[in-house]
Swiss-Prot record:
Designated name of the protein: Apolipoprotein B receptor
Tissue/organ expression: Expressed in peripheral blood leukocytes > bone marrow = spleen > lymph node, and only faintly visible in appendix and thymus. Expressed in the brain, heart, kidney, liver, lung, pancreas, and placenta. Expressed primarily by reticuloendothelial cells: monocytes, macrophages, and endothelial cells. Expressed in atherosclerotic lesion foam cells.
PTM remark: There are 2 forms in macrophages, the membrane-binding proteins 200 kDa (MBP 200) and 235 kDa (MBP 235), that can be reduced into a single active ligand-binding species with intermediate mobility (MBP 200R).
Positions where Phosphothreonine occurs in the chain: T572
Amino acid sequence: MDFLRLYLPGLHQALRGALDSLGTFVSYLLGDAVPTVEREAQAAEELGVVAVGKTGKIVEEEAQEDLEGLRGSQNEGAGRLRGPGDDRRHEVGSSAVEQTWGWGDGSSHGSQAERQDSGAGETAKAARCQEPSAHLEARKKSKAGSGACQDRSGQAQERQESHEQEVNREERLRSWEQEEEEEEVRAREPGMARGAESEWTWHGETEGKAGAVGPKAAGDNREMEQGVREADAGETEEPGAEGAGKGEEVVVVEKACESTRAWGTWGPGAEPEDWGILGREEARTTPGREEARAILDGEEARTISGGEEAETASGGEEAETASGGEEAGTASGGEEAGIASGGEAGTASGGEEAGTASGGEEAGTASGGDEAWTTSGKEEADLLGVRQTEYGAVPGERLLEATGKVWVLEEEGDEEREAEVSPFPKQPQVLGTERTEEAAESQTAGREAVGGQEAGESFEGQVDLRGKEAEMRQDLGIRADRARMEELVQAEEAQEERGSSRDPVAELPSDGEAEGTADLEATPEARPEEELTGEESEAAQTSCGLLGVEWGGLTHSVTKGQGPELMGGAQTPTKQPEEREAGEVELMGVLALSKEEQERSLEAGPRHAGSVKPEASEAFPGAWENRTRKDMERGNTQEDAADGEQREEEETAGGQTLAAEAEGDRESELSEVPEAGGEGLTTQDAGCGTEEGEASVSENQELDGSTGADAGPCPSLGEAYARETEDEEAEADRTSRRGWRLQAVAVGLPDREDAQTGSVAAGIMGGDVVPHISAAGAGEALEGVLGQGWDSKEKEEAAAGEHAGGQEFGLEGSAEEEVTGRGSQVEAFESREGGPWGGRVEAEESAGAEDSCGLDPAGSQTARAEGMGAMVEAGGLLEKWTLLEEEAVGWQEREQREDSEGRCGDYHPEGEAPRLLDAEGLMVTGGRRAEAKETEPESLEHVRGQEEQPTHQAPAEAAPESVGEAETAEAMGSARGGAANSWSEAPLPGSLLDVSVPRSRVHLSRSSSQRRSRPSFRRTPAWEQQEEPPAPNPPEEELSAPEQRPLQLEEPLEPSPLRHDGTPVPARRRPLGHGFGLAHPGMMQELQARLGRPKPQ
């Protein structure tokens, strides 16, 4: 449906334009499975344009008749949801709420609600100030339409039904329209200019998307619009209410509604589909539908700001719209956050205004309310979507909506957050954000919002920008989610950009120490996010858009989530839904953890710790405790540094963060996805902890290198090498990760589920094993991604642990550049073993153990072994499990053993080998991967076993297998001294070459022999044929080692034809039972011999 919506907008507009005068026909067509939301939006555009002149009013009325009919059914279906709002705007509100609730009830209602939005948009345009209820209604419609966007895809039938209902509702809508006109007159008295102004300002300013706080500068219609567009995303209604119900606001609302509907609307309701769909529709339909909706929202906001209906429409309808319009939009979410914050659920009108006041605070809080509000609103919208994603893609909004208590649920969550979030001035923002975020991540996003406000108010301007950029990225990410290959390209581009953004982002990771925590903990999410990415990552990304500035790492993780979704999503779109759901839960818990840590770092944690901890505990009890300890330690140390660094670096790296976010999104999340439990957490766990974690999360590893270097004893070397390496790695990572992502995501997704459990657990459990598990989870493909992440981490950790020092960074950097994957990993691993090992192990196991199940290295190792065990179990390699257990014995031993056991596991052959097995060598790095792919899993295991031995002998060998990793390992060896010597000593595993080559030869010979033997055995007598066909089959199908052996045997047999009977014929016959075996010069003779032989016998 997304593509249909993408492509149907023209059809929708054309149909809608034709149907403008045919309300029933409109409802009929809108009832079609064709995405009606776009039609509605387009019709809303057309009808709205017509409606601008009261001439369109007739059409509007017709459309409203349809909408009313729709509402009639929606009133029925959505009546339960409508209850709150019906009371408030019972006449118009009922239908509008019905629409809102209706589309909550069904996408048919939603789409029709959107059609209603069209009609309502038209009506609202014509009767822009007629009735704020109508505006809210239309706005709800628009938002409902947004929700409908996602619903309608699945509920086209319901749409058809609701078309009929829509007819009734449109009839009602006419009455409402009239009432709205009356109220519009009343509203126009203060805001008549709003009516006309809002109509075309609405249109003209639809273009002024970005803007200041909009509603605050109500006079600055376009500025407001721009700001409100975003602010309206969260504040549309509030800004409208604040904006004194001005047409400007309407304009703002329009654009804000675009963003709101794109963000707020589909954040809450349209979330999964609608984010992408609404993003597209927004782009497509934004002019019409979003305009109509924005107008409706704007009118609502205007009227609300007008204050006549501001309390009533805003309070009653908006609370309703908050209930349905929270869904209806982040504006509702924002207002609702404000409402829930100010009036919580009960004071919907007062709370709307309170929310507007809160929203004013929010809007006024540094535009912090507005920006943070916008961001929060977007976060809300996105996080509502995320929440809905939590509940199931749409369910968050739908669930709330179905509950008829969207705003109530959000309020409740927000109330919790309110309890959690002490600052109410911010809390309106936080609550609005949190409310939606609560929906999305219940408490986690709220903490983000709070932490975001704490750290983010400083950055809220940036947060707004970043939130907008993040949202824009989300739009792109959502759309790219739809077109994930695009995002893969974007991710690559972002990674390339990341090369340039890395240093700033490295700085961000510094401020992102706490962010790193978020990223690291968001990292477990990252995998789910990679799956959830479009939804939750966007939601988290939006929440991180607000918090993204704050939570550079979190934004990275969120954005990363987006990136992997772009990448991994494109790669594994099927898994994403499942993993997204699971990942959503994990995302909530993990985000809760990460946000919690971040907020702790921001010192907001204590407030939220209680709330976050349950979520985190739910998601990962051990991780929670460990993170709590880790966060306490980090929070103490990094809290101050993170706050200051975050603000400074976020400010400095504001744009860079965005770029890095977009970049780090994809790259980091990929690394994070596999690294989610691994690199991110491990990086966290590793020396620099959050900084590294975020750095790796942000830059994956390059930033980690620099951040780690910053945090590490050798910041200069670390940074220099890390950044040099980052640039190089950026390229290498882009190159490798593009491939690795695709492979690793494809390979790693199934594994990632396992690895996510294992890696999240193991990532929680231990940093080193976690990266290994991550690699295991993601496979070497991810290992390539993680490799540098680990490399960078280890560079960080090397930087953190001066053991690696600048040399390791440089060597690792260059080696990573060369190897980028395994070589760097080997280097990093050697760093672990070597000097860096001490620092890394100490930092990693201390922080890692903290992050991991145990604070003690043994605990982290045990956790690692356990997590790896899960990974190994997933891999089905108990050997590696044993090695994982042995891993606790010693990293070098583990390394070697793992190397021996997991041929792919330069770092953790353990986890990787299982992944390799899982991927059947897909994850096998470089030649191994191709080789493993060529080689069957069996032979892969053989090869692996054989390779593992050489790998055991020399991870550097494994690295050389990967290509130049031997050089890397050797370079590392020279850098690290004898550390790499043992690795590079052993030659490349000849067994691999032997195994693989014989296999290929066997295949060739088999195919030829079979080809020749088939006609032969066909000629052969039935009994011989019977004997022979099995042999041909095994060569063809089994390609079994026995076949290879017989081939080898037979070939030797050819030289000695006398071998059997001493007679050439028997020699030709050789073993009749073998079939013809390999094609050989004597095949014909052998065949003839066999044919002639059986006759005597």
